[in-house]
Amino acid sequence: MISKIISKIIIACLIISSQTTQAQTADSILLKDIVWDKTAPAGMTELSIPSENSKIAGFMYSANGAQKHPTLLLLHGFPGNERNLDLAQVIRAHGWNVIYFDYRGSWGSQGQFSFENCVQDVKNVVLFCKKYSDSLHIDTSNIALFGHSMGGFVCLKALAELPGIKKGFALSTWDIYSDSKDLKPSQVKEAAKQMGEYFILNTTSEKLIKSVMANLSFFNIQNDAGALANKEIVMLDEHHMNQQLAASLKNSNNNYFDYEVWQTDHPFSNKR
């Protein structure tokens, strides 16, 4: 049995599920050094990715070998202090490329930050992967998403809007809809104060909240249950606030859906 460790869960879902032989221990699944390919060794490539009229900063941990590799996109939270790059190294060691990027208006990327723009950024990164699939050795038939916190919301929303992507991992998903649906206009300033002013460009916390309130249906992931029905989805939480959302998605899912609540903190510090 795979223990409740994020990296082992991801390896099991991404790699083992596509193999015929599963007689491996948890440690042999996880611990694997890279033996460099002499002609196309594993490495890191800096990326400047177009998204609408802006450039977003990113990089790719490229897998070993000149063949095209399946690729995982890491989607950070708000503002995105936990990047999960430890997981990226493990996944790369098992033959996957891993792309990390910063949404528009965050952490040095150009443009305006908004939750809606984050979802569009994922779609534009996928287009970038397709355009440069040969030079970056990306198997565009096998791209998966991994999101944490706000990135969990972005993961599920983008997964619903990208029919060619079949797998998503949503870690401690921020249910923006549930947090905003009962908010009154008179409460916006206080909510913005509690949210704080993070390092984001060309917007404010108050504007972000007002944008959500003006487009609540977009943020209700349960509205996307049909589009997610044939996806493979893993949702992990450290709390029980997403149980209703998870139950709704699971009831509509025809492929694979797993939801678990672990004893940990928001960044899953003891479950790497």
Residue ranges and their predicted role:
Residues T25, K157-K207:
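Hydrolase active-site cap/lid region
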Residues K68-G77:
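Short beta-strand element of the alpha/beta-hydrolase
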Residues G77-V90:
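The serine-hydrolase catalytic nucleophile loop
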Residues I91-Q110:
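Conserved alpha/beta-hydrolase
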Residues F113-L136:
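Alpha/beta-hydrolase active-site loop
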Residues L136-S149:
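Alpha/beta-hydrolase fold nucleophile elbow
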Residues L208-R272:
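Serine-hydrolase catalytic core
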